[in-house]
Amino acid sequence: MRLNSTEISKLIKERIAQFEVFNQSYNEGSIISVSDGIIKINGLSNVMLGEMILLPNNEYAIALNIERDTVGAVVMGPYIHISEGAKVRCTGKILEVPVGDNFLGRVVNALGFPIDGKDSIQNDGFFPVEADAPGVIDRKSVNQPIQTGYKVIDSMIPIGRGQRELIIGDRQTGKTALAIDTIINQKQSGIKCIYVAIGQKLSTIINVVKKLEENNALFNTIIVVASASEAASLQYLAPYSGCAMAEFFRNKGEDSLIIYDDLSKHAVAYRQISLLLRRPPGREAFPGDIFYLHSRLLERASRVSMEYVQKITKNKITGKTGSITALPIIETQSGDVSAFVPTNVISITDGQIFLESNLFNSGIRPAVNPGISVSRVGSAAQTTIIKKLSSGIRTALAQYQELAAFSQFSSDLDDTTRKQLNHGQKITELLKQKQYSPISIAEQALILFVAENNFLDDISIDKITKFEKEILIYAHNYYFDLMEEINKIGDFNIVIKDKFIKLITEFKKNQF
């Protein structure tokens, strides 16, 4: 077989013409030090603050310090296999987490990977962990309530959809219990819940998951976990990841509730990272941007307008408003709310629910101090019937607490003072509530009506709990339609008032 030189030449030219040169440049550097999850990198000239940096073995770090010659980055996870001299490169992206409806009912880590031993999760896309909060024009006023199921909160410290309400108190005062009960109470409301556990013991988190399962509330909840045994970088990231998952529901025109348990441990994790990055420490050794750490997180919680939802979904969803309601938790030391992190978060949020260890230890659960607890925007969102019936409760409690303090110094009290003290004690007893037992709007309305209209005067304090339990059973058995109507419309009128009086009179005459 003879080879034709012309054909060979033609074939070579065709192959050369078809050859494509792929020229892809990378911004590459090398690790010069590794310690405590922090790496120092030399040679990254075009890195962005917060950018993901690709490490060996497909691990990632986030650039947090940009200096003249080096970049300080925090490794997202284990760092044992990382060594000095290893090559790293920029990705040009900020960190994103997977989001979607399929995450409901699952337990995931701070990066969105399932850790509950079940199947992998099919996501509906990725959202950035660091996102801008909606602007003033994109927001809508808070005018719809979130029912916690607690009489003392829904009546005196109401929470609205899109609000940020701080839960603050010493350890072991019922902060997490209050948050979990709020999630349990949302299983019929359609509000999607995200519980972010930061720096908690795994045994505590397992108990939370178990309680939500027992109360049929896990199907509506995403649990994001960065436990005490995990790296500080993941504890720092977890709240932002949870918020990104909540934004997925908000952008669809749905309401979501997110609980950060707790931001004190989040601040400690960030302090640890900052000190390892050699940032200058300030008050209580926290870095200078500790306020911004929490403000940029909590400002993402809001109620957005129909136009915002329409714009962000490119007209796929119209006529709906979305919201993120945030319940951050802060742990205080010996009731000191004037510490650095508590005062920061108090100034960012729209109110606070203060839990006192003295009240908790004396058997008042939830241990809410109504004197210094406040909701700055929730009253506009409060259900009409609860708003009308609870107006005198706070005043009566405030008078009772003032008189109770005064009566310790005087043994000779007049009849009016003694009557006010007795009434205050009965209201305090009536507002007590067991854990994992949230109650409906109608049940709250009936109990508040009893307290407001002096139907407790002839009942001794030790029988208040029994009276409350039995009157609710009686109401559901004989006035079921009335209770359903109140739950549906949430309004108060003369007809409902007359029916309440009839119900209470009949019950006290025949049953109690």
UniProtKB/Swiss-Prot annotation:
It is an enzyme of class 7 (translocase). The record marks 373 as: Required for activity. Transmembrane segments: none annotated. Keywords: ATP synthesis, ATP-binding, Cell membrane, CF(1), Hydrogen ion transport, Ion transport, Membrane, Nucleotide-binding, Translocase, Transport. Disulfide bonds: none annotated. InterPro entries: ATP_synth_asu-like_sf, ATP_synth_asu_C, ATP_synth_asu_C_sf, ATP_synth_F1_a_nt-bd_dom, ATP_synth_F1_asu, ATPase_a/bsu_AS, ATPase_F1/V1/A1_a/bsu_N, ATPase_F1/V1/A1_a/bsu_N_sf. It holds the Pfam family ATP-synt_ab_C. It catalyses: ATP + H2O + 4 H(+)(in) = ADP + phosphate + 5 H(+)(out). This is ATP synthase subunit alpha. It comes from Buchnera aphidicola subsp. Acyrthosiphon pisum (strain Tuc7).
